[in-house]
């Protein structure tokens, strides 16, 4: 309990800082992907890009859809269990991120295999158990390979077979943040360009990822607070 308090405390202090400030000082993350302008009551609204619906299977063979992840902030990545190169390091760093927010129920990790033929629900369950990854905080998914690769493309990450690569697959070392409405969120770089994703093998980008999760948590809690006051 003491360890959890120490790990979560920086995020809680950030929330306290944000709520102690005027609304005008609140800074949040940008939306990734093309916006759509739609007519509404004689005016126009901006609809932010939402990741496509998906239907995959978790380690208990239960169906998980995108809409079931609503009201959750999650970091999405791609991997495969027999990956001999980058995946062990990727998931080590992602696990450290997860530990930082262990006390916040609305935050999770979601990792989707790019090798569903080998990575069945039971295989992923064994993989998760062997590495002691918390099933309450980290969801591993498998499913139709074509659907997985289409989702990767739709969220601007790479995932495909490559027989010349070690393990037979190539995928991004980057992860993305998905907010509670299915939007990809990210900071801007020093030149004002939206970063989009975070290379979890890069220490600087890992720190950015952690900081940006705190920002989204603050925004989510602020919005819930404002809705209660309406």
Where does each model-flagged region fall?
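Short loop/turn microsegments at loop-to-beta-strand junctions
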Residues: 51-52, 74, 172-174
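Structural microenvironment flanking redox-active thiols in thiol-disulfide oxidoreductases
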Residues: 91-151
